[in-house]
Every structure is written in C-alpha cells, then in structure tokens.
From Swiss-Prot:
It is found in: Cytoplasm, Cytoskeleton; Cell projection, Axon. Residues 26-74 form a coiled coil. This is Neurofilament heavy polypeptide. Pfam families: Filament. The gene is NEFH. Neurofilaments usually contain three intermediate filament proteins: NEFL, NEFM, and NEFH which are involved in the maintenance of neuronal caliber. NEFH has an important function in mature axons that is not subserved by the two smaller NF proteins. May additionally cooperate with the neuronal intermediate filament proteins PRPH and INA to form neuronal filamentous networks. Its main location: cytoplasm. Keywords: Cell projection, Coiled coil, Cytoplasm, Cytoskeleton, Intermediate filament, Phosphoprotein. The keyword DNA repair does not apply. InterPro entries: IF_rod_dom. Forms heterodimers with NEFL; which can further hetero-oligomerize (in vitro). Forms heterodimers with INA (in vitro). GO terms for cellular component: axon; neurofilament.
Amino acid sequence: MRGAVLRLGAARGQLRLEQEHLLEDIAHVRQRLDDEARQRQEAEAAARALARFAQEAEAARVELQKKAQALQEECGYLRRHHQEEAQAEARDALKCDVTSALREIRAQLEGHAVQSTLQQEEWFRVRLDRLSEAAKVNTDAM
C-alpha cells in the first residue's frame, strides 16, 4: 500500500509538471496568435493604404488625361483660329510679311504649350511625391 501511495504521489507530481508545461504551451500559442493577429491587421492596413494610393494615382492619371485632351483641343482651336487670322491678314495686307508673323504666332503657341506642360508636370510631381511619402510611411509602418 505504501508503494501505491508513493506511485500515486509520483504520478501526481508528474501530472503537475505536465500541467505546467501545458500552461506554458498555451501561453506561447496565445502569444503567437496575438502576434499573428497584429501582423494581419498591419498587412490589411497596408493593403488598404496601397489600394487608396492606387485609386488616387488612377484619379490623377485620369485628371491629367483630361487636361492633356483639353490642351490638345485648345491647340487645335488655336491652330484653326491662327490659320483664319493669317488668311484674313494675307488678304487684307499683301505687303505684310506672312512668314515672320507665322513664326511669331507659332513661337507664342509653343511657349504657351511648354508653360502648360511644365505646370502639369510640376503638379503631377508634387502629387506623386505626396503619394510616395504616404506609401513610404505605410511601408515603414509595416
């Protein structure tokens, strides 16, 4: 009987030891679960930020396309208008130097086109820099 009591005591000690190990394993698994949940939330936040970035970039692209189309239409209008004016001036004043007038008008049109293009490029660079900073912040946050 004494041997049975000793065996039961040893078994009890072994069970307590196993229980402690199981509690440690449970705590470790919970910590891993918490870490993975946090990482998943961070990844989801980064994915949302990238989706917003993509939407903003697409909106900027569409806006720039609209501006480019408007500039092309304006350029076509200016060309037509210029041609009409040049023809009227040629009829009114044959002595006028048509070549120099056309060069001057063309230079003005090119100057306006270059200025407009530069303004668009600057706007796009600023917007792209802002979006890149936001993406970098989100990437750093991950």
